[in-house]
Design a protein with these regions (language model features):
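Glycine-rich, proline-tolerant flexible connector loops at the mouths of alpha/beta enzymes
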Residues: 113-118, 122-130, 189-207, 325-339, ...
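Alpha-helix-loop-beta-strand connector modules within alpha/beta enzyme cores
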Residues: 133-141, 145-146, 153-159, 199-227, ...
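Active-site mouth loops of central-metabolism enzymes
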Residues: 84, 157-172, 294-304, 365-374
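Conserved, mostly hydrophobic/aromatic
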Residues: 180, 383
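N-terminal small/glycine-rich loop or linker at the start of catalytic domains
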Residues: 64-72, 141-165, 283-296, 359-361
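Phosphate/diphosphate-binding glycine-rich loops and adjacent basic-rich segments that engage nucleotide
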Residues: 236-298
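Hydrophobic faces of well-ordered beta-strands that scaffold small-molecule active sites
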Residues: 155-164, 188-190, 218-226, 243-246, ...
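Long, compositionally biased, glycine/small-hydrophobic-enriched stretches that function as flexible linkers
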Residues: 1-142
Length: 454
């Protein structure tokens, strides 16, 4: 295992695979804040050269956190399909990149070997790819999951309807839900981030969602994105629930900062399979985002792309229905501007797909970041080309509760029309039956939620 190279007369030596991974990363303010990123473009290129020559066995044998010290590492390593791994262990990272991008390599081929990849391998190959490489490679990979409906089918583009409200007012939430449905949003999930994180409030909102879903016979899923334990208590108290949500991290310490461990998630999954209202078998919803581990001092010297890949390795253990990165949510301290947000969104989507999970993206930014709505629309268009499973839908793209900017209801509808994609089939049929969509386009009824009042 060689950790040095010479470029144009200068020799670059790296102390560990963890350092190589960090310095091979594209520029991110989060890595610079942590003191991990390359100091110069030349050092970044040198790290990429060294990384390209490492074997997949090198990466498996040197996880960024030791097996004995981190639960996430143990899950990733123990879940590995040894037969798939043995078939590729001698490949270099460069070999893996060339194979994924080869015209002769199919999505089915990639899915077959993906169970033999650790998260460090996934992150490593991502770092050697251009933005177009990430789009091209991700578009090959189809990952589906089933809750009440099936997400990720070829030819579909889904949307989470996110009716957040500053006071959790049921009527305000309902107004956003009905408007979003009329625009074709909500086939991925109708999911609210509550202001009040209590089992009582979770149950109250879930019952309202269930009332709307049952009255109009809407083929979708419902979820309230409170802490996992609050949702579990609400379900035990009798609340209807299709999906249990939790934000996750790429290290045991990061998950502890979020207030849970793997046993908590396993318990939540079992609870919903036995007491939830969904068909299943995929009944979990996870959100991630580059930089979350650094924000809780849980990165242990690893870069944010590698940490993000480890989130996906952790997630796939629990067979989720939805996973999405909230790509610009933490702010410019981690992703400085539109260029970094765009890169991170493409990286996260590719790494999620390569890890074998049904991947979506919250294309978003904070108000103090050097990005605007045009940048987010650009990212959504690129991710649609990459085969992203779903986006967010918030009234006018302005989340007045979480105080950040993301995609609105119209963006997903426009991208569906541009690319010839539809909502999930059962939901698309419902939209047509209700008169909101005709011949693949929104009708004049779109945007008028009053037609769904009852």
């Amino acid at each position: 295992m060689k950790l040095k190279t010479t470029l144009l007369g200068s020799t670059y030596t790296f102390g560990s695979i963890r350092e190589v991974l960090a310095k091979a990363n594209e520029e991110k303010t989060g890595d610079r804040l942590a003191g991990l990123g390359a100091e110069t473009a030349q050092e970044r290129i040198a790290a990429k050269v060294v990384l390209s020559a490492l074997t997949l066995a090198d990466l498996r044998e040197n996880p960024v956190f030791p097996y004995e010290q981190d639960e996430v590492t143990r899950i990733i390593q123990d879940d590995l399909n040894e037969k798939a791994y043995e078939s590729i262990r001698g490949w270099t990272v460069s070999d893996l990149r060339e194979w994924i991008l080869a015209e002769t390599t199919t999505g089915a081929d990639i899915r077959r070997i993906s169970r033999g990849l650790t998260s460090e391998m996934v992150a490593a190959v991502c770092k050697l790819m251009s933005n177009l490489d990430l789009i091209y490679a991700a578009n090959k990979i189809t990952v589906t999951a089933h809750c009440n409906t099936t997400i990720g089918l070829p030819g579909t583009l889904s949307c989470r309807l996110q009716p957040n409200h500053t006071t959790d007012d049921p009527e305000g939430i309902t107004a956003s839900v009905l408007e979003g449905l009329s625009f074709g949003a909500g086939d991925a999930v109708i999911g609210l981030n509550p202001v009040t994180d209590s089992p009582e409030q979770v149950g109250k909102v879930l019952r309202r969602f269930q009332q709307i879903k049952e009255h109009w016979q809407i083929p979708t899923q419902i979820c309230v994105l409170a802490h996992v334990t609050a949702q579990m208590k609400a379900v035990r108290d009798g609340a209807p629930c299709d999906l249990i949500f939790q934000s996750i991290a790429g290290s045991e310490k990061g998950n502890a900062a979020f207030g849970f461990n793997a046993a908590t998630i396993a318990e939540a999954r079992e609870l919903l399979l036995h007491q939830g209202t969904a068909e299943g078998p995929n009944v979990l919803y996870f959100e991630t985002g580059q930089g979350s581990e650094l924000s809780s001092d849980a990165h242990h010297g690893a870069d944010q792309v590698t940490m993000e890949a480890r989130c996906y390795g952790f997630a796939r253990h629990f067979k989720p229905f939805l996973v999405n990165t909230v790509v610009g949510f933490i702010g410019p301290e981690y992703l400085y501007d539109a260029r970094q947000v765009t890169r991170a969104g493409l990286e996260d989507h590719f790494m999620g797909k390569l890890s074998g999970i049904p991947m979506g993206c919250d294309c978003c930014y904070t108000n103090h970041m050097k990005a605007d709505q045009n940048d987010i629309e650009n990212l959504a268009a690129l991710l649609t080309m990459a085969g992203c499973n779903y986006f967010m839908g918030i009234p006018h793209g302005d989340d007045i509760m979480l105080n950040y900017q993301t995609t609105g209801f119209r963006e997903t509808a426009a991208l569906r029309e541009l690319t010839g994609k539809t909502a999930i089939p059962e939901f698309q049929q419902w939209l047509e039956k209700m008169g909101f969509v005709e011949n693949g386009k929104l009708t004049k009824k779109a945007g008028d939620g009053s037609s769904l009042l009852f």
